[in-house]
Amino acid sequence: MFDSFLHKNMRVPYRLHAKKMRSSENPKAVVVFIHGIASNAAMWKKAESEIEGEFDIYAVDLIGHGKSPKPKWLGAQSLAVQARAVRRMVFTMKKYKKPLFLVGHSMGSLVAAEFSKMYPNLVDKIFLLSPPIYSPEEARESVQEFILKKSYQKIVSDPKESIKFVNTAIGMGVADVEKFDSQEQFRPVRRSLKEAIIQQDTFAVLSKTETPTKIIYGAFDPVVIGRNIRKLGRINDKIKVSRVLSAHDPTKSMISQVSKDINKALKEQK
């Protein structure tokens, strides 16, 4: 009850577990990696080595994941609550006056977009890798999007059957994450799916964003709706879109674009 009062009613941000992946003597910027659903900070180990430049690089465990808190109150894993926790992490680094770049994958990209809406003066650019951005309710959905949303609702409402389905999908290589051994382990993932992905308003957020944004997605990604992303690129000139030959997980070509764009942005700031 106290946890709910403190973090829900008083809106005190949660303290996320964060891993410092690189420390530079004279960092030109701070880069924060934000993982996707059912993952954790460790997923960025290879990506960190592919970022070129003198940066301090961090990776966080989002609420409900890894070593971060796993609260049970409704809404604890919403995008706004996650973004507040990322802001706390940025402040505690004591280097938030440096240029800040957020790199999010999948659900983490939705958190990065929410952060840019809530704290536009804190972030210089966001990179959204494989973002599952879905249409507003009043918009006309594609068949793929309709099926995805129905599948997500099924996972949330029927945990017994859905854990089998998800583990089968993981076994087929749809996502590079560990299989779930129990409902206790699976519960935070279902909460994230409901509160962050199903209940998102990221399309509306990005359609109005003033934060420089780069979206990179795979041509063969089964959970990303390419036409939604391309539409955002058309209606907002702050958003640049790139499609690569990949599925859902981050690839070397994605991280290479991130690295080049960060260094380009820093040169343009001089």
List the predicted regions and their residue ranges.
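Alpha/beta-hydrolase fold catalytic core
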Residues: 1-32, 52-56, 89-97, 133, ...
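Conserved HGGG/HGGXW glycine-rich cap/lid loop of the alpha/beta-hydrolase fold
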Residues: 19-69
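Active-site loop/oxyanion-hole signature of alpha/beta-hydrolase fold enzymes
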Residues: 62-103
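Flexible "cap/lid" loop of the alpha/beta hydrolase fold
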Residues: 113, 117, 126-155
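Conserved alpha/beta-hydrolase catalytic His-Asp/Glu region
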Residues: 138, 153-208
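Short beta-strand/loop motif that positions the catalytic acidic residue
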Residues: 209, 215-217
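Acidic catalytic loop of the alpha/beta-hydrolase fold
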Residues: 219-224, 248-249
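Catalytic histidine-centered segment of alpha/beta-hydrolase-like enzymes
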Residues: 246-259
